[in-house]
Design a protein with these regions (language model features):
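A short, well-structured alpha-helix characteristic of acyl/acetyltransferase catalytic modules
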Residues: 1-57, 168-169
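C-terminal "cap" of GNAT-fold acetyltransferases
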Residues: 3, 13, 128, 137, ...
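A short helix-loop-beta-strand connector motif used in the catalytic cores of GNAT acetyltransferases and
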Residues: 56-69, 80
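Conserved beta-strand in the GNAT
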Residues: 69, 77-85, 94
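Conserved acetyl-CoA binding element of GNAT-fold acetyltransferases
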Residues: 91-102
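Conserved acetyl-CoA-binding loop-helix of GNAT-fold acetyltransferases
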Residues: 100, 106-120, 143, 147
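Conserved beta-strand-loop-alpha-helix junction that forms the acyl-donor binding cleft
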Residues: 105, 131-142
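Conserved GNAT acetyl-CoA-binding A-motif
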Residues: 123-133
Length: 169
């Protein structure tokens, strides 16, 4: 089972918490309200709740993987999800996914969630560098990461990833 199954990270604008199966309808609603992200991720514009549930189950099944709901602190409403992994690949941590419902974008929730995750990785797990996966063709995701200090780099595997140093040595 994932190490992120009982995680809660508090912040002033949003907090991150491990969702349970009862949260799946709210997560589906986020994906329905973010068709651009869902299409880039799955290759299909048609929302499939089974695909969203499989992504959720897969994230919870892996060690060192955190799949967290993004909730507004003022209303406690679920506005997105963030998924990251520690201790894998060529880098100490990888952002696997971050989605905020379109109706909630531009309000700082995605930025706040990513900053909470980066601080958690640096302060709790000692991670100094994080890479990020961006689905092909998801230009909004690439622009978002670039605005937050991520840079596209070639890894030893010759693969290109978005990378950011989140703590000093």
């Amino acid at each position: 089972m994932s190490t992120g199954t009982n995680t809660r990270i508090d912040g002033p604008l949003v907090y991150l918490e491990s969702p349970g199966p009862e949260h799946l309808p709210a997560i589906w609603k986020v994906y329905l309200d973010a068709p651009d992200y869902f299409e880039a991720l799955t290759g299909s514009a048609d929302f499939d709740p089974t695909a969203a549930e499989m992504m959720y189950e897969e994230a919870l099944a892996e060690d060192n993987r955190y799949y967290l709901a993004i909730r507004r602190t003022d209303t406690k409403s679920l506005v997105g999800t963030i998924e990251f992994e520690a201790g894998a690949d060529e880098v100490p941590a990888t952002l696997r996914g971050l989605v905020v419902a379109q109706g909630e974008r531009g309000k700082g929730y995605g930025r706040a969630a990513l900053e909470l995750a980066e601080n958690f990785l640096a302060n709790e797990l000692g991670v100094r560098t994080i890479a990020a996966d961006v689905p092909g063709g998801y230009d909004d995701g690439a622009r978002f990461l670039e605005a937050l200090g991520y840079r596209e780099r070639r890894l030893k595997s010759a693969e290109f990833r978005w990378v950011k140093r989140i703590a000093e040595s």
